[in-house]
Amino acid sequence: MTPLLELKDIRRSYPAGDEQVEVLKGISLDIYAGEMVAIVGASGSGKSTLMNILGCLDKATSGTYRVAGQDVATLDADALAQLRREHFGFIFQRYHLLSHLTAEQNVEVPAVYAGLERKQRLLRAQELLQRLGLEDRTEYYPAQLSGGQQQRVSIARALMNGGQVILADEPTGALDSHSGEEVMAILHQLRDRGHTVIIVTHDPQVAAQAERVIEIRDGEIVRNPPAVEKVNATGGTEPVVNTASGWRQFVSGFNEALTMAWRALAANKMRTLLTMLGIIIGIASVVSIVVVGDAAKQMVLADIRSIGTNTIDVYPGNDFGDDDPQYQQALKYDDLIAIQKQPWVASATPAVSQNLRLRYNNVDVAASANGVSGDYFNVYGMTFSEGNTFNQEQLNGRAQVVVLDSNTRRQLFPHKADVVGEVILVGNMPARVIGVAEEKQSMFGSSKVLRVWLPYSTMSGRVMGQSWLNSITVRVKEGFDSAEAEQQLTRLLSLRHGKKDFFTWNMDGVLKTVEKTTRTLQLFLTLVAVISLVVGGIGVMNIMLVSVTERTREIGIRMAVGARASDVLQQFLIEAVLVCLVGGALGITLSLLIAFTLQLFLPGWEIGFSPLALLLAFLCSTVTGILFGWLPARNAARLDPVDALARE
């Protein structure tokens, strides 16, 4: 008969300083399917080390160990995990149940890593618990169960994937005599069902219940009676089959990892909340700065547009402040007509201006009188609260009409409801009021100077007596590039004048400069916010590292029941990402509250959350979770199962 478990000259040594301490010294042992074997020895005899090697939790330093003819030395970590999952079931002295899972969920764990579908897994767990007399305790947590009940849950977990070989480490060591007898009775039943049962104990009375007692002392076997031949030994109950395959198994495994991660986080609510706090603040900072910064930028740009965008102003001279007399008369009415004929010009309005006195009855104030065309008000986005602008007939006839700004109206007519039709003196010229223009309110503030507008023909012919213009404002048609239009305008006037005796001021250039400045400022503030997100990510990493340390025994349990290193890595990585995603969602909620609060105090601001901003926030959360969760997850996946199980 071929042995199920075959050990030949197994040695295991551990480093102790500069020396190697040999714990197992040439162990040779055969265990057959269906046997009930007890390995007995005093503390320090090497029996636990031998059990770890038998259960593929540890590897021998030298020698050969075969499981059903398969040499385990040739297997990698994942293959060893599969071997544990499909052939071995562990029963520990301290039960090693996961405290945040119910009895039913604890029993299901091995089948999760085997890829068994959820419905099958649930039915099998319930069947095993019912068989062991725990059908009314399936939803109980370990802390709610007695020691004997916890050990029975541990036995059910060992049987979940079939449990061909049951490895029981001091199964009665933490139990009272009655519970211990119940556990031994269950082990005898498992032997009768065809399971191979290996009991590791220091208690001779427990060992005596086995068919074969192997004694180990100082790393050597001192007693090894021959095996009792079993008839029709099957080597265990039917293996669990019908596992999902391909992408379904991957999706199912991911869902289970997500569920387990959520349960682990829910079991430590305060720690989870503290872990999330840094992410909440970081995401809220990033989203708030991006959204509020964008609202501020749009408001600034709107203010700039309110004073005229897509416009080019032409002034005489070389630059602002140039009062050289030879340039004062550079711009003529013929230049205006030539500009208006260009295909890229939507409108062109001249301007002549002079500071004059305005009088009405006994009110006498100083104001800036500006001669313009009717298009001037459209160019600068001005509206009329009363009346209207002057028409072409009034321009051609040098009509004595005037448009007031709202401040001038208030100074001259503080008590009149309607001022259209009233006559005032502009300088020494009487003029009839035909409208009141409202300038757009700007965050840059309003001018304190009172302003009135007359037809440019009236201003130059009747008031100032000059034949030249102080400036020309050109509005570029939609679809034409403003910079290209500025070049063509410069070329046109230079050809007409034979020299460049003027300069231009492009408002689009100002707009682009402001856009660049606000973009740079927003980027800087975003980087500051990203730093807070990075700090939050480091906090996640620190807490997850602590979590790995605290949950070392849990990791060992999962590996013992068949979890691969990749399964452990996936679970802890999902936990980190889950923390960051939930923290990100709370951070977005916080940023929404901040935005709505700001909007209450800043009614002119239009704060909106674009889908892109929300997507970027969740992307940041996910990336943060992956980046800062990878190191703790990797540390967890690299743990040695024997060392992990030994830690408390």
From Swiss-Prot:
Top-level taxonomic group: Bacteria
Keywords: Antibiotic resistance, ATP-binding, Cell inner membrane, Cell membrane, Membrane, Nucleotide-binding, Translocase, Transmembrane, Transmembrane helix, Transport
Residues in coiled coil: none
SMART domains assigned to the protein according to its UniProt record, in alphabetical order: AAA
Transmembrane segments: 273-293, 523-543, 576-596, 611-631
GO CC aspect terms: plasma membrane
Subcellular location field: Cell inner membrane
InterPro entries given in the database record: AAA+_ATPase (IPR003593), ABC3_permease_C (IPR003838), ABC_transporter-like_ATP-bd (IPR003439), ABC_transporter-like_CS (IPR017871), MacB-like_ATP-bd (IPR017911), MacB_PCD (IPR025857), Macrolide_Exporter_MacB (IPR050250), P-loop_NTPase (IPR027417)
Any GO BP annotation: response to antibiotic
ABC transporter domain residues: 5-243
GO molecular function, one term: ATP binding
Residues annotated for ATP binding in this entry: 41-48
Transmembrane keyword on record: yes
CDD domains cross-referenced by the UniProt entry: ABC_MJ0796_LolCDE_FtsE
Membrane topology: Multi-pass membrane protein
Enzyme class: translocase
Subunit structure: Homodimer. Part of the tripartite efflux system MacAB-TolC, which is composed of an inner membrane transporter, MacB, a periplasmic membrane fusion protein, MacA, and an outer membrane component, TolC. The complex forms a large protein conduit and can translocate molecules across both the inner and outer membranes. Interacts with MacA.
Membership in a protein family: Belongs to the ABC transporter superfamily. Macrolide exporter (TC 3.A.1.122) family.
Protein's recorded name: Macrolide export ATP-binding/permease protein MacB
